[in-house]
UniProtKB/Swiss-Prot annotation:
Residues at which GTP binds: 11, 75, 144, 148-150, 210, 232
Coiled coil (residue ranges): none
Keywords for the protein's UniProt record, in alphabetical order: Cytoplasm, Cytoskeleton, GTP-binding, Magnesium, Metal-binding, Microtubule, Nucleotide-binding
Lineage: Eukaryota, Metazoa, Ecdysozoa, Arthropoda, Hexapoda
A Gene Ontology molecular function term of the record: GTP binding
UniProt cross-references to InterPro entries, sorted A to Z: Beta-tubulin_BS, Beta_tubulin, Tub_FtsZ_C, Tubulin, Tubulin/FtsZ-like_C, Tubulin/FtsZ_2-layer-sand-dom, Tubulin/FtsZ_GTPase_sf, Tubulin_C
Name of the featured protein: Tubulin beta-3 chain
Amino acid sequence: MREIVNLQAGQCGNQIGAKFWEIISEEHGIDSNGIYVGDSDLQLERVSVYYNEASAVTRSSGGKYVPRAILLDLEPGTMESVRSGPYGQLFRPDNFVYGQSGAGNNWAKGHYTEGAELVDNVLDVVRKECENCDCLQGFQLTHSLGGGTGSGMGTLLISKIREEYPDRIMNTYSVVPSPKVSDTVVEPYNATLSIHQLVENTDETYCIDNEALYDICFRTLKVSNPSYGDLNHLVSLTMSGVTTCLRFPGQLNADLRKLAVNMVPFPRLHFFMPGFAPLTSRGSQQYRALTVPELTQQMFDAKNMMAACDPRHGRYLTVAAVFRGRMSMKEVDEQMLAVQNKNSSYFVEWIPNNVKTAVCDIPPKGLKMSSTFIGNTTAIQELFKRISEQFSAMFRRKAFLHWYTGEGMDEMEFTEAESNMNDLVSEYQQYQEATADDEFDPEVNQEEVEGDCI
């Protein structure tokens, strides 16, 4: 089957990853020891996308299912908490790869010094996992861009895997620094250096933002003091939604490559804004029967987006929607068309039919139907602009730079990363303003393109 190898790097990546495996295991009826306890053949039909079946424990019980997951960090702390967590016994012990020194929120340590020493060990495990696959579809990495390990070592790993498996899809779930909530002073540096790598080396990057997740918890879910567990739960719902079609039968299937082909009009513009519906508070779920129109409306709502950008400030280049549950295909098609017609000014006119829909028959646990939203919108430039402004403010004064140059980095790298990110913003802006009649000349200097959001 089309397998996906999951990598989780750093503290944030491992915490999101751990939650993701909880949700996926529940959907496939696999308990915390990797034993199948489900009640439907559909759960096992394509379980091999994310799980490797180890040898049978006893004749009657069948095998143990082991996640195709590689957990890495530069300090042992998070690994220990994953290992002692509810699903800690699920993972293959050899797939925990960690150092002792930590990256200290320093991208250079993760990318050039500490991380570079550990990366070969990780690649050995990656090769071993890939050899266990019949037909590897690609990789997914969960990490944050603000710290040291997830950002520095995560991007190093991406470029190494890209060299070795150039024709496989590389998918990342990247937690970007929030506008108001900041964990680390040097977040803008780490994020800019990471985005510089992601632009070149990934096929699809889902931008997730803690602040947007907090807002969803406060406003929509009515959770008064959300924990990281609540936030990670939201992220893992999206992750599970994106790969549903690979794991369960459906009427209209999508896989990572189909998504990439439909979602990425230009190779550099592969940063997506994810969303999920229905977001109802935990207690009230079972009291509401959702309809397809409600799902669609909620899914396109700015309040449901998991990145702190307002899609109304830009235009959608492309959109993908993955619906789950028993529903009428006709109704889904009509609703998606209605959204496009009603809000046509928010979709670029030069990509007709720019909404891709997939429908899978099996709903997530506890819901009758749900939908996952993936939008490639020019409004994502707000996110890059924000990081760029914070980066420039510090870099102008060369604040904190000695931590990076001390690990062997050069100032030139910072300048390059900054201009690459500014180019990205200009490209988004350029396509936001383009109309179907424009003669597109790629030679036009992108710096000249300016203008206000619609």
